[in-house]
Amino acid sequence: MLLPSIPSCSFSFVVFVSVLLQTCFSFQLTPLSPKNYPPGASIDTTVNTISPFIGDGRGSDIFNYEYYDERFHFCRPENIAKQSESLGSVLFGDRLYNSPIEIKMLENQDCVPLCASIIPSSDVSFIRDLISKNYVVNWNIDNLPVATYLEGTNSKNYSLSPGFPLGKNTEKGVILFNHYDIVIEYHTTSSDQHRVVGAYVKPVSKESTLVDGNPVCSSSSNPQYLPEGADLTLVTSYSVSWKYSDTPWATRWDKYMHIESRQIRWIFIIHSAIIDTFLIFVVSIILYRTLNRDINKYNSAFVDQEDVQEDFGWKLVHGDVFRPPRRPMLFSILLGTGAQLLFMSSGIVLFAIFGIVAPSRRGSLATATVALFIISGFVSGYVSALSYKLMQGMLRKRNLLLTPFVVPGFMLAAALFFNMVFWSKSSSSTVPFSSWLLLIFLYLLFTVPLSFVGSLIGFRSREFVPPVRTNQIPRQIPSHSIWLSSFPSAIIGGSIPFLVILIELFSILDSLWFHPLYFMFGFSFFCFGILVTTCIMVSIITVYFQLCSENYNWWWRSFITPGFCGIYVFIFSVFYWFFKISSSSLATAVLYFGYSLLISVLVFFLCGSVGFFGAFLFVNKIYASIKID
């Protein structure tokens, strides 16, 4: 009997989840229903952040800045209004405000001056520095990112890159783009409704001109250079033109989702699948040939006992194979966290496959991540308690209390530190204090109670009965090959799951640090499935050879070996820094390597837990198949 109050606990769990989802998604998500505009109607235009971009394959910084940061001196509307954002948008650094640019459906505008501003020399130097680091400006028109055409594409088959350059480095100096040629594509439905299906900007640099102190559109072909050590008077202007498009509203995001490396990705996924298939084949050989033959021989009444002692090492440790590992408290907490991350990752991939998480829903990825992590506190508590009980741990109350606080507490402390670094650089990525309070409130109100409920159910669940008895006196472990030691096994075994996600890791890091849209969830779905399978296969093979060498300390080994994939992720991040990021900023380095370390640790927990679960089922299965006198 599991728990007398299971029905009431289940009802409470459902209520908790319902309230949590309502709380998380009560933040405005980007709407997915089309908006129709009659001729002359005002188009929704907003400004976002100034963000880094990978120029010539390299990035130079990772800090975002608000569009209306005083150092930019951009033109402002009469009343600046902050736009509603999802929780995920706030966490990912989006800061949306209304725009001073007025656009009306099907009305062309030829060079409209916005304003004139005086930029002091210190701010000119700041802007020059960002231009040299390939920063881009981010606008939105009808909730669609304003973009520029990617180089090397043609008019029939083109893709767009969200954002447009702040300026450009030339041989004569640094120029600032202060005129924006805005081209908006529209589509007319069968009911004569007009919809925005594309928006891009061709930024131009024009020498600023004032007439009687008022800004006017310059007819000069000279660019606007940014002087060194001097103030600058800047005039900003824009033009608007409309272009009909056959693209329906439902597919307007396809232009942003051009994948030039699609063929390479499929080839890599096929290679990863081949590796995975080979591992499955090896495990199948072990299970259906070697083990089956060994078990039949071992169970035979006519086999000589000395032959058994000689030939079948994995069966000799049957009296110790379920002996509890060292540090069961720590081990169980890490397994609970890994199960929580597995639940969260699986949910995100499934949400993306079904379109709940998509680039068109701004902030949906981060919002879903937060919601799933909070809900999966139940999974963490249950798996941690069940594992601790399996390992014959005695401090159950301590396990119940530590599970929801150890790893999440480490993550919170790291995130607060990173937030202080963002704040010191006046970056828009600084998470507001109110958002921190909300996250902590959600965690304490939902995750901690859910974790406690999961732990109670786990501790009161049916006792696990090992298929073989554990001897009172531990068996002496003989010496074995160095290749069967923990470290060499982890180095070899952890490299295989890492190779499965290597190509996808490039795209994830590019999206994380330089903000291109990440939409390749189809590839992620295959990679994630192959990763999970590979971790299980690697762990099973490692444990099998370890048991064959009569070493029964397999518990931690089954966790560390596939978990070593996280170490490779960090090593890869170091190479990514040297080959893709050219920055001498200490703050940038601290943030980059801090986030990389945090992500690598979480990958370690995820892969390690998956490997242990597979190995435990494997060990339980094979020892349940032999007869012990």
Swiss-Prot record:
Keyword Transmembrane: yes
Keyword entries, A-Z: Glycoprotein, Golgi apparatus, Membrane, Signal, Transmembrane, Transmembrane helix, Vacuole
Subcellular localization(s) per the UniProt record: Golgi apparatus membrane; Vacuole membrane
InterPro entries according to UniProt: EMP70
Name of the protein this chain belongs to: Transmembrane 9 superfamily protein C1105.08
Glycosylation site residues: 157
Superkingdom assignment: Eukaryota
Signal peptide: 1-26
Annotated family: Belongs to the nonaspanin (TM9SF) (TC 9.A.2) family.
Transmembrane segments: 267-287, 338-358, 365-385, 402-422, 437-457, 489-509, 520-544, 559-579, 599-619
Membrane topology: Multi-pass membrane protein
Parts of the chain on the Lumenal side: 27-266, 359-364, 423-436, 510-519, 580-598
Topology feature Cytoplasmic, residues: 288-337, 386-401, 458-488, 545-558, 620-629
Entry GO terms, CC: endosome membrane; fungal-type vacuole membrane; Golgi apparatus; Golgi membrane; membrane
Stored Pfam families: EMP70
